[in-house]
Amino acid sequence: MWGRNGKECIVVFATGNANSSISFPANCDDRILTVGGSNSSGHRHSTSNYGELLDVVAPGTEIPTTDLLGRYGSDNKGDYYMNFGGTSAACPHVAAIAALILSVNPNLTRAEVNSIIQSTARKVGGYNYTNTSGKTDGTWNREMGYGLVDAHAAVLKAKQKL
């Protein structure tokens, strides 16, 4: 976690795809920003892990990506593209938002970046988000965390802290 001249590195980690409580390695440090997956309807992806350690969700279904052809790849269509899913597909969205935040305000600490991502997440899916003890960045839900990440809102909030 150390780095950035004492501001700490932002670490995002996928919660896992077992449709159960978050476990190792996503639960090994409370400074990790844990990311679950959401589907195109704004609900928790059916296999995305959940629970007290969940911070946010990001799109985790039908994410286009590049791939290899042949026996080392999964691309059967021959066009170098395939769809990727699960919490490992959701996690890069959050890492990219953290990078965008730091591109407009590189003086933010890890804790501030995590807080911006969590506090600007959208409450989607019809879930009941409530004030929860220990969750200081707004209302929270055990299946969706603080909600679906919102890159635009996060960058705007980072700019306000300049």
What are these model-derived regions, one by one?
Residues 1-67, 115-121:
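Catalytic-core segments of hydrolase enzymes
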Residues 60-144, 148-149, 153-156, 160:
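Hydrolase catalytic cores
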